[in-house]
């Protein structure tokens, strides 16, 4: 699922920069 998330991150950041911050935190927790 890491690959899928990595691919979706750019799309989310491009559409919703504000949401991108929340996603970055979620991804950081998911990786750790």
UniProtKB/Swiss-Prot annotation:
Residues 1-10, 18-32 form a propeptide. The keyword Transcription does not apply. InterPro entries: Amanitin/phalloidin. There is a cross-link at residues 11-17 (Cyclopeptide (Ala-Pro)). The keyword GTP-binding does not apply. GO terms for molecular function: toxin activity. Processed by the macrocyclase-peptidase enzyme POPB to yield a toxic cyclic heptapeptide. POPB first removes 10 residues from the N-terminus. Conformational trapping of the remaining peptide forces the enzyme to release this intermediate rather than proceed to macrocyclization. The enzyme rebinds the remaining peptide in a different conformation and catalyzes macrocyclization of the N-terminal 7 residues. It comes from the Eukaryota. Keywords: Toxin. Belongs to the MSDIN fungal toxin family. Probable toxin that belongs to the MSDIN-like toxin family responsible for a large number of food poisoning cases and deaths. This is MSDIN-like toxin proprotein 2. It comes from Amanita rimosa.
